[in-house]
């Protein structure tokens, strides 16, 4: 049964089917430890291109000890055809302990996720916003420094610069959504509208 967040745009049936197909052996390996699997990130935005972008998949487990990790590793699909699944494995305790450390990421996931398997374990969490401004400023400064260094190193190589910008686009979109939240605004689901709102 699927659960949809307010900001979510439904992924294509093909993407959902491919993700569930990837997840099936992983869920089987986790057995009773498996709790939930969520799509999150750009796959739930308008204009997502599965040929180029990765499908972010959060998998929540009761435990992730070494035996469990070995069981999961042995069944991880090796098919490199699109869509490309990017899994993040966490326990409930790890989520609880990281909410205040990574407010940007968790607020974004809380507002833009789709439960595709298991029970909803994210619904009861509240993300503290006390560190949001600090993390946002730190990451924006880091991104700007990285882009400046890339420009200086590759000014004569426009294709390299284009690749750097493309690789940075998704993370900048996440930061822009966080900037809107810091201003007390609700970010739209469409990335283009997010950028327009930040530019106003």
Regions found by a protein language model. Give the residues of each.
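Short gly/ser-rich loop at a beta-strand->alpha-helix junction or flexible surface loop bordering the NTP-binding
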Residues: 35-43
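Metal-dependent nucleotidyltransferase catalytic core
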Residues: 6-28, 45-52, 57-102
């Amino acid at each position: 049964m699927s659960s949809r967040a307010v900001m979510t745009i439904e992924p294509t049936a093909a993407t959902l089917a491919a993700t569930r197909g990837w997840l099936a052996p992983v869920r089987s390996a986790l057995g009773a430890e498996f709790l939930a699997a969520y799509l999150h990130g750009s796959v739930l935005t308008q204009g997502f291109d599965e040929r180029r972008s990765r499908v972010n998949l959060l998998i929540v487990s009761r435990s992730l000890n070494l035996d469990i990790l070995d069981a999961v590793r042995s069944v991880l699909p090796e098919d490199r055809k699109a869509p490309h699944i990017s899994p993040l494995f966490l326990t409930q305790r790890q989520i609880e302990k990281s909410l205040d450390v990574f407010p940007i990421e968790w607020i974004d996931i809380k507002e833009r996720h789709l439960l595709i398997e298991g029970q909803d374990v994210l619904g009861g969490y509240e993300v503290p916003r006390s560190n949001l401004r600090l993390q946002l400023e730190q990451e924006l400064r880091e991104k700007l420094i990285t882009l400046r260094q890339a420009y200086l190193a590759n000014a004569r190589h426009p294709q390299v610069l284009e690749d750097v910008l493309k690789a940075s686009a998704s993370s900048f979109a996440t930061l822009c959504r966080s900037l809107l939240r810091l201003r007390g605004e609700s970010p739209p689901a469409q990335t283009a509208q997010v950028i327009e709102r930040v530019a106003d």
